[in-house]
């Protein structure tokens, strides 16, 4: 079977490879390209690159990649024709296949695709009923009085379901769709006594609900006459699952990636108004708590999430619960606190679009700052709560991945407890550590190293200095750790504290992607080991290793009996100082030989 080349080109032009790959891979911008862990093979260091300019992807490890069709073929393990059809469905391009064999070879639409087609066909009918019929005039006036322009109504595909039990039913039946499938799609309801079917949505303003690819998979029908419920949503179906759907994600995804932030609101109406006001990276759940599936998808797009829930007690409680969960999941969490009793729609209606966008830009707090401001009265007047929340907030701050954001949170939170940021940092470092971490001895017990004072780090041997510098570079970058971890025998460390830190780093990087001292100290429960970690944190060393610098440290630690260029240069200078020509000649030959080895 063959597909017309113009169709293939249209699908390729309408499919952004960055959006496509982002559904499977968490990508980070590196220069002009994006990089992430390859979805086709296991790896710890990202080697999968996506070029937005060239619209291609490539893995430097397993060599797989290509354009949007080749990526889809690989990720779904399907043929080229199937990949074209799938991507065509994604961007609403019909794929006409010229069969070289009988028509039976042409793949018909799946039930899921037929369900989506039903939703998209009836949307056109609903839109017509709202904008072109007498019956829809009252609903249209209701929308216009609430700031919905004709352009916004068209952009969002808003429609009207007439007050008829068979409007949708008859329309779909005339189009040749199976009525039972329309019921399973959530467009119809069923009388369980006589098994007759009737419209689920009647006399309601219809808001289409789209999946991440922009396909309509459900509806939310809003009353405009005061009937209950206020909003009637599609039921759970094979194509509409609330735990997987974030309203407006299809429109907001590019802005989320560009701004490296997603803003979560309570309802889709707030999203529509916020988006119209100029806030383009907004989404909302469909009346449910943020699910694990939601969080997984968000983490593929960004590590920064801002909560902007209603300014009432329920909104505050939801913010605390949701924010705590997101923080535990390793995301950077921020909060925009709306004035009491207001939601985004009401704020925009009262103050206008410009005031709203300025408020959002200038009134963003870390979750820890928001939480302590909510609890401030209890902290101030209840000593038991003071201790409890001091520990809670210390733990919350320790979960933050950015050391810069941690320091800002320390500065913001400390005054609520009448302590200095340094004292709060000490609470994090010394009282939040979990179970003991010591290496095991031959009997299975734990050995605590002999005490060593911070001052003793100023009197290290040449070998210990190499160990310290080596660890410092490993602490700065996970990729460096992964590249060099197996190059060193831990038993070759002469400083036992450094040896234990080396082992701590192994455990730390097994669970974390980026090193920070607040997280690392939780992997030890020894004052001496914590002191060593803090000393290494404070140790000043060049940010980027010089050429072969780390290799030199590895050689020293492993005691390979090979002089480093640094030590040979030092000995050459000493031989020159004392005037020993033979030694000068010897060390110069050694330096030349070592430089040749590196070439």
From Swiss-Prot:
It comes from the Bacteria. Its cofactor is Zn(2+); Mg(2+). Residues 260-341 form the Toprim domain. Keywords: DNA replication, DNA-binding, DNA-directed RNA polymerase, Magnesium, Metal-binding, Nucleotidyltransferase, Primosome, Transcription, Transferase, Zinc, Zinc-finger. Coiled coil: none annotated. GO terms for molecular function: ATP binding; DNA binding; DNA helicase activity; DNA-directed RNA polymerase activity; zinc ion binding. It catalyses: ssDNA + n NTP = ssDNA/pppN(pN)n-1 hybrid + (n-1) diphosphate. It is an enzyme of class 2 (transferase). Monomer. Interacts with DnaB. This is DNA primase. It comes from Staphylococcus aureus (strain COL).
């Amino acid at each position: 079977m063959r597909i017309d080349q113009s169709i293939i080109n249209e699908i390729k032009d309408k499919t952004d490879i960055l959006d496509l790959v982002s559904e499977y891979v968490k990508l980070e911008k590196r220069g002009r390209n994006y990089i992430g862990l390859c979805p086709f093979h296991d790896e710890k260091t990202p080697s999968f690159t996506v070029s937005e300019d060239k619209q291609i992807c490539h893995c430097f490890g397993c060599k797989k990649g290509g354009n949007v069709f080749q990526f889809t073929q690989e990720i779904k393990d399907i043929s080229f024709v199937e990949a074209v059809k799938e991507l065509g469905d994604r961007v609403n391009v019909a794929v006409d296949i010229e069969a070289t064999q009988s028509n039976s070879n042409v793949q018909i639409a799946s039930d899921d695709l037929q369900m989506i087609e039903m939703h998209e066909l009836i949307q056109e009918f609903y839109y017509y009923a709202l904008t072109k019929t007498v019956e829809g005039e009252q609903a249209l006036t209701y929308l216009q009085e609430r700031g919905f322009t004709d352009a916004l109504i068209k952009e969002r595909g808003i429609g009207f379901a007439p007050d008829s039990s068979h409007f949708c039913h008859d329309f779909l039946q005339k189009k040749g769709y199976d009525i039972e499938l329309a019921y399973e799609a959530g467009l119809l309801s069923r009388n369980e006594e006589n098994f007759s079917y009737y419209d689920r949505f009647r006399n309601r303003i219809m808001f289409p609900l789209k999946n991440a690819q922009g396909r309509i998979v459900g509806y939310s029908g809003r009353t405009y006459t005061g009937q209950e419920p206020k909003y009637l949503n599609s039921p759970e179906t094979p194509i509409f699952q609330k735990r997987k759907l974030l309203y407006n994600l299809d429109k907001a995804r590019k802005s989320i990636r560009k701004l490296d932030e997603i803003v979560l609101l309570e309802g889709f109406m707030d999203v529509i108004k916020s988006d119209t006001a100029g806030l383009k990276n907004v989404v909302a759940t469909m009346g449910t708590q943020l699910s694990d599936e939601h969080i997984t998808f968000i983490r593929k797009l960004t590590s920064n999430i801002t909560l902007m829930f209603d300014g009432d007690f329920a909104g505050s409680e939801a913010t605390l619960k949701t924010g705590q969960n997101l923080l535990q999941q390793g995301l950077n969490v921020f909060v925009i606190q709306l004035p009491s009793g207001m939601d985004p729609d009401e704020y925009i209606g009262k103050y206008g679009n410009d005031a709203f966008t300025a408020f959002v830009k200038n009134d963003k707090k870390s979750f820890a700052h928001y939480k302590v401001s909510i609890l401030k009265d209890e902290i101030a007047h209840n000593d038991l709560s003071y201790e409890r929340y001091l520990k809670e907030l210390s733990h919350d701050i320790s979960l933050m991945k950015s050391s810069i954001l941690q320091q800002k949170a320390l500065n913001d939170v400390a005054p609520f407890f009448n302590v200095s940021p340094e004292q709060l940092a000490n609470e994090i470092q010394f009282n939040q550590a979990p179970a003991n971490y010591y290496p095991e001895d031959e009997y299975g017990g734990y050995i605590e190293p002999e005490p060593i004072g911070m001052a003793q780090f100023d009197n290290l041997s040449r070998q210990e200095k190499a160990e310290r510098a080596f660890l410092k570079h490993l602490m700065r970058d996970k990729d460096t750790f992964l590249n060099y971890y197996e190059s060193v025998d831990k038993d070759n460390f002469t400083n036992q504290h450094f040896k234990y830190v080396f082992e701590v780093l192994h455990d730390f990087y097994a669970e974390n992607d980026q090193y920070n001292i607040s997280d690392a100290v939780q992997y030890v429960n020894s004052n001496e080991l914590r002191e060593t970690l803090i000393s290494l944190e404070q140790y000043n060393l060049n940010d980027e290793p010089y050429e072969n610098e780390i290799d030199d440290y590895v050689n020293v630690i492993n005691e390979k009996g090979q002089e480093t260029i640094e030590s040979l240069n030092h000995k050459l200078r000493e031989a020159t100082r004392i005037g020993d020509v033979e030694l000068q000649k010897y060390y110069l030959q050694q330096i030349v030989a070592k430089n040749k080895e590196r070439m």
